[in-house]
Design a protein with these regions (language model features):
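Metal- or metallocofactor-binding catalytic centers and their adjacent structured scaffolds
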Residues: 176-213, 394-397
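Intrinsically disordered, low-complexity regulatory segments
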Residues: 1-104, 113, 180-184
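C-terminal or mid-to-C-terminal helical accessory/interaction module adjacent to the motor/catalytic core
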Residues: 80-159, 205
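Alpha-helical scaffold elements adjacent to nucleotide-binding pockets in ATP/GTP-utilizing enzyme cores
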Residues: 30, 34, 53-61, 81-85, ...
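A short, conserved structural fragment
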Residues: 243-257, 447-455
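Conserved short loop/turn motifs at secondary-structure junctions
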Residues: 46-48, 123-127, 204-213, 223-231, ...
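Basic, low-complexity terminal or inter-domain segments flanking catalytic cores
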Residues: 61, 115, 186, 262-712
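Short acidic, hydrophobic short linear motifs in intrinsically disordered regions
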Residues: 211-224, 250-258, 413-425
Length: 712
């Protein structure tokens, strides 16, 4: 479709106008010349809707007979798979082609019909997207929940019985306690210190932990994001190369199956290959179920594709490491390991659970004993089960509550979405398909509707505004269920159960209704002036406008260059609708925040540490930073307390001295216990990493020794 115009004739059954992509004319010329010399032509594009559409376009370009069986497809680029595909050619699936055409035209209609309204309301650089706008809405609504979240104090309570059994508070008055928020109940718990509790239940249960399913596109992207730090687009780019193949000892080998799939199905041949490998490497007892379970709610599965797996399990990551670059090795290792794990036996274990009670207060403990390690032999889940010997405890036994371990904390707002969790959310809502997840995320980032903070999505001001206006004027486009229903209807077109032109007509008719309503509303909206409580040099209130970088204040005199950015200033939609915004105090407060807040920590040179905020949140900086260059990081838990406003202030000064003295004392004890580096003899230092604090040798980079900090 052309880049500069809609390219769809809405008055002629939505007939698309296809153009040759710039620079690809020579490729078409070569294809035509080669086709004249060929005895037989096979169309072997990717085995999905996009691939089917490409095959159809090539067939049209080469003037091939659509009734001829010239379409072949395979899920892996191996000699055997290709030969098998050539033996079983088929006709081009026109229903699948129409499904892909309908998707592209739907996206065009939304983009070209709705975006002009956004240009008028917000800025010429904005645009609407059928699926990306719904993804933006999900991110914005989550941010609203985070902003409106009010932390609640709670207590995590553990009881230490007879000096050795560490049990969690379980129930009070037959109600399960997840987070204890009632201070009266806490006092009631404290009263039972040094009292006897009786074991009212002790039982052993047999448990099974099944291995995870084979990978599909969404779970591949999620795992690559979580474990490797790959973006969705990077994951697909590296996977594409592994699928296309690598030269290994002079032989070209496709290493993985097709990576755009929403199926976790595995072929019988691949299962048998895995069974032979597992029997040889681990023994027959480690063989998994012949027919491992698949998810029942995989409603979005388009076809009979396999999950993502290695083409040959015998090509272990270690065997082919030298032929892969760093990223290829990481991703292949992930895919290979997950496939192996999925075909291994379940882990079997016994769980001993016991409950102690006194006066309707219960504590619960559990310990696990692995009976058969199964897939745990190769891979243990991050949240490992507590493993140990079963204590000799039976019903009727009595234990003394020696000590209470009470930790005060505050409830946390919902976590922002990462690339991994956004893909998971889109999939669970039925929005998008394997081929679109990466492009949805890329579009949001390129349009600057979202930004990444600590690998999590935060909507930008311009993103919020786009979401707000689309929600207001085109609620159907922004409706998650409506978007998911469209995806289902596209699947129906693919299966031949729905006519693609009927689908487009229904959609476009409804879209036009909203457009008509929108035109009049937009004109009224544009006539409105939103004044601020700041008076400009001309004596008139500055007015709010929206530009490339979000909201800003400007003079009512068009020739004036008086502008004030509103970045970081929260303005409610109610204020904007009222035509008057109050931002003067907020701007002053923001300026104060940039200047910093005094703390009670004084350095040896007499300089005071100032609390400041940067790209990664709060940090401490000397008020004489230009002279002494002193800057300190703030531990994550302390940052949270600062954000929740739970650290005391005296005479306008933030009291952090006592907290940091305690941390420094703890760190000194850790370093004393650690001693010198056993490799080079130099002292250790404490560093903060992705998983928390760790010990690192000060001899770095010559000595790269690191150690975990032993828990007390």
């Amino acid at each position: 479709l052309p880049k500069t115009k809609i390219g769809v004739d809405v008055n002629n059954d939505f007939k698309p106008s296809y153009n040759t992509i710039k620079g690809k004319g020579e490729v078409i010329k070569q294809l035509k010349e080669a086709s004249k010399k060929a005895d037989k032509i096979y169309l072997a594009s990717d085995p999905d809707r996009e691939g089917e559409s490409i095959a159809w376009h090539i067939a049209n370009t080469l003037k091939l007979d659509h009734n001829e069986k010239n379409r072949i497809e395979f899920n892996e680029i191996t000699e055997k798979a290709i030969k098998e595909a050539v033996k079983n050619p088929r006709k081009i699936n026109i229903s699948r082609v129409n499904s892909q055409q309908a998707r592209r035209i739907l996206d065009r209609l939304v983009g070209y019909e709705i975006s002009p309204f956004l240009w008028k309301l917000i800025s010429p650089n904005t645009s609407a997207g059928r699926v990306q706008s719904v993804a933006l809405k999900i991110i914005c609504e989550l941010e609203d929940k985070i902003k409106s979240f009010v932390p609640e104090k709670y207590w995590d309570v553990k009881g230490i019985f007879d000096g050795q059994y560490n049990l969690n508070l379980y129930k009070i008055d037959d109600k399960k306690i997840d987070k204890l928020k009632d201070e009266k109940l806490l006092e009631r718990v404290k009263k039972d210190l040094k009292k006897k509790y009786e074991v009212i239940s002790s039982k052993v249960s047999n448990k099974i932990k099944n291995p995870p399913l084979p990978l599909k596109t969404s779970t591949l992207q999620q795992l690559a994001s979580s474990y490797l730090g790959f973006s969705a687009s990077k994951t697909m780019m590296v996977a594409q190369k592994l699928y296309e193949g690598i030269s290994i000892n002079g032989e070209h080998k496709g290493l993985i199956t097709y990576m755009r799939t929403d199926s976790t199905r595995i072929s019988e041949e691949a299962k048998e290959m895995a069974r032979k490998y597992i029997t040889k490497e681990y023994g027959k007892e480690y063989l998994g179920s012949v027919s491992p379970k698949t998810k029942k709610n995989d409603k979005n599965v388009q076809d009979a594709h396999e999950g993502v797996r290695p083409t040959d399990i015998n090509l272990t990551p270690q065997k082919i490491m030298e032929f892969l670059d760093k990223d290829q090795f990481k991703l292949y290792n992930l895919i290979w390991q997950r496939f192996l794990i999925s075909q291994l036996a379940a882990m079997k274990y016994e769980q001993f659970e016991y409950i102690l009670e006194k006066d309707k207060i219960q504590y619960r403990g559990s310990i696990n004993k692995i009976i058969f390690d199964g897939y745990y032999k190769v891979f243990k889940e991050e949240e490992d089960l507590p493993i140990g010997d079963f204590p000799e405890i039976k019903e009727g036994d009595k234990f003394t509550l020696d000590k209470l371990d009470i930790k005060e904390d505050y409830t946390k707002p919902p976590a922002r979405l990462t690339e991994s969790s956004l893909v998971k959310t889109l999939e669970s809502e039925g929005i998008g398909r394997p081929s679109t997840y990466a492009s949805i995320i890329d579009t949001l980032k390129k349009r600057e509707y979202v930004e990444l903070q600590n690998k999590s999505f935060v909507p930008t001001e311009i993103g919020y505004e786009v979401k707000t206006q689309l929600d207001k004027f085109f609620p159907n486009i922004m409706n998650i269920k409506f978007t998911a229903k469209l995806e289902d209807e596209l699947d129906e077109v693919d299966s031949g159960d729905k006519d693609w032109i009927d689908l487009l007509k229904t959609f476009y008719t409804e879209l036009q209704k909203y457009e008509e309503k929108c035109k009049a509303s937009v004109e009224k909206e544009l006539e409105k002036l939103v004044e601020s409580d700041i008076i400009g040099k001309d004596g008139k209130p500055l007015i709010m406008k929206i530009g490339r970088f979000g909201r800003y204040l400007t003079s009512q005199d068009e020739d004036s260059k008086e502008n004030i950015s509103l970045k970081g200033i929260e303005i409610s939609l109610e204020e904007i609708k009222s035509g008057k915004i109050y931002v003067k105090d907020k701007i002053e407060e923001l300026l104060k925040k940039k200047e910093g807040e005094k703390t009670d920590i004084i350095l040896e040179n007499g300089a005071r540490l100032i609390l400041k905020y940067g790209r990664f949140g709060a940090y401490l900086e000397s008020e004489k930073f230009k002279e002494d260059n002193v800057r300190k990081t703030i531990p994550k838990d302390i940052k949270t307390k600062i954000e929740n406003n739970t650290i005391k202030r005296e005479n306008g000064i933030l009291c952090l001295k006592e907290i940091f003295e305690k941390i420094e004392a703890e760190n000194a004890a850790i370093l004393k216990k650690a001693g010198k580096c056993e490799k080079c003899g130099k002292p250790f230092e404490i560093k903060n990493g992705r998983w928390g604090k760790f010990l690192a040798c000060t001899g770095y980079p010559e000595c790269k020794n690191i150690k975990k900090i032993e828990k007390k």
